[in-house]
Regions:
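Alpha-helical structural elements
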Residues: 11-13, 21, 30, 70
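A general, composition-driven signal for non-globular sequence regions
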Residues: 1-3, 13, 36-39, 45, ...
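Mixed-charge, Lys/Arg-enriched low-complexity segments
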Residues: 43-79
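Negatively charged, low-complexity tracts enriched in Asp/Glu with abundant Ser/Thr
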Residues: 1-16, 50-59
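A short, structured beta-strand/loop element
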Residues: 20-45
Length: 79
């Protein structure tokens, strides 16, 4: 598991990233937002980003959802 930090509304919050190689999925959790998602590890960069945007857009403004999804996508693909 990788723990990253995200700047959100003048706060630093923890983001937990886990890749299960055996079952081919990513688990991403941001407890301070009461949010988590499971993504198929077979998705490409664009698909990961789009899925994250859709998930985040349900409770974040569009610009915030885009910013957070972009950062999460970078972390997922670099780890």
């Amino acid at each position: 598991m990788i723990i990253k930090q995200l700047s959100e509304q003048n706060e630093i919050i923890n983001v937990y990233l886990y890749k299960n190689v055996h079952h081919a999925y990513y688990m991403i959790a941001i407890p301070d937002m009461f949010w988590s998602v499971e993504l198929n590890a077979q998705l490409n960069e664009q698909e990961i980003n789009e899925e994250l945007i859709m998930q985040l857009f349900t409770f974040k403004e569009e610009s915030e959802a885009l910013r957070i999804a972009s950062q999460l996508s970078k972390w997922i693909l670099s780890g």
